[in-house]
């Protein structure tokens, strides 16, 4: 697994989170990297947030796992901002697509978080599923369940090493 770079935002999060779910999102902006997104959310009140941003070559953490990010809302379903971890995949492929490498890095991060928090595979969901089908996120989730099912099948078989650690910059 890639090292997790940290740029923890002082904005847009709750002081409490009890991770029982993982919500998969996509950034929705073409060619925006994980580092760009972490910097953007670090820079001010954006009225949204996510725990992690993932691209082809890096993973950036923007909100502590123990804090609730503003990524799925609080009242619509059993999954909410205070019991889930939000992961945003960056869109580096054409037409707001997610590359295979970004998807693989996301799989490894999700597997690591599942192991760390005891989250079952059934509790890994897309934002689309959580929102009651009102938010097409990731962009392939509304009309390509085969891709998400394949993502979850891969997830069931991914072996992941723990991320490296060093002087506060990497988890």
Label each PLM-derived region with a short phrase:
Residues 3-6, 12-18, 90-171:
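Basic/polar, cationic surfaces and motifs that engage anionic cell-wall
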Residues 1-80:
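N-terminal catalytic cores of peptidoglycan-degrading enzymes
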């Amino acid at each position: 697994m890639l090292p997790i770079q940290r740029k923890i935002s002082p904005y847009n999060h709750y002081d409490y989170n009890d991770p029982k779910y993982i919500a998969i999102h996509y950034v929705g902006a073409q060619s925006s990297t994980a580092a760009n997104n972490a910097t953007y959310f670090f820079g001010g009140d954006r009225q949204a947030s996510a725990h992690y941003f993932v691209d082809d070559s890096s993973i950036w953490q923007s909100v502590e796992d123990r804090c609730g990010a503003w990524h799925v809302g609080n009242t619509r379903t059993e999954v909410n901002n205070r019991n889930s971890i939000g992961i945003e995949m960056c869109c580096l492929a054409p037409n707001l697509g997610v590359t295979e490498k970004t998807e693989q890095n996301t799989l490894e991060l999700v597997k690591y978080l599942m192991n760390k928090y005891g989250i079952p595979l059934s509790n890994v969901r897309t934002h689309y599923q959580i929102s009651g089908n009102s938010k097409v996120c990731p962009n392939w989730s509304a009309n390509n369940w085969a891709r998400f099912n394949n993502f979850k099948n891969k997830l069931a078989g991914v072996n992941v090493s723990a991320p490296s650690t060093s002087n506060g910059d990497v988890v």
